[in-house]
Amino acid sequence: FVPVKEIRNGTIILKDGGYRGVLICSSVNFGLKSADEQHAITLGFQNFLNTLDFSIQIVINSRRMDLRPYLALLEEKAPAHKTELVRSFTDQANIMTKSFYIVVPYTPHVSAASSVSFLRHESASVKSAAAETSFEEDRAQLEQRLSLVANGIGGTGVRAVPLGTEEVIELLYRSFNPGELENPIRLDN
């Protein structure tokens, strides 16, 4: 169902051998900008897209905001009637939080040497060391792409930061389990 093989060092490794890195991005309130600023942002985004020689995926995640911790704090500090007013308002209003992500792909190229390596008998430790070296080289290529995207989108006023392993796991977990707001995520190592 989900093509994720593993997540290592903030890198999503797919079952087909591809890699994905995820940047979390700040937002820009485009509607509050002047016409000149909007034009500059639009041109900056167009220039950013034109510099890419690989595809990216822009993901916007909208979730209903859980205000229960805030309401609990209000109950401690404010009179009961004000807390009830806020509670009824939050029940009626659909207060949302939005998160913005850019997913950056990298697909390693299979070299001729590695494609015939299955013909040779090598020890498990040699194969493991070679696989780790290959992973680090491929991850370095993905990190270059992540840096290119973060710097490119930065020209529009958007800050982008790569997610670490735990943040990627949480993002995937929350994406595939949208109804579970308060349950902690179990990381089985």
Each language-model region and where it sits:
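An amphipathic, basic-hydrophobic helix/alpha-beta surface used to engage anionic
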Residues: G21-L23, K33-L49
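An aromatic-glycine-centered, glycine-rich loop/turn in mixed alpha/beta architecture
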Residues: F1-P3, S88-N189
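Active-site-flanking beta-strand signature of metal-NTP-handling nucleotidyl enzymes
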Residues: Y19-V28, F100-Y106
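N-terminal basic/disordered segments at the start of proteins
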Residues: F1-D16
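Short hinge/gating elements
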Residues: C25-G31, E132-F135
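Ordered, soluble secondary-structure elements with a strong preference for glycine-centered loop motifs
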Residues: G31-H39, D53, E136-E143
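N-terminal pre-first-transmembrane
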Residues: Q46-R64
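Structural flexibility/helix-modulation signal
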Residues: R64-Q92
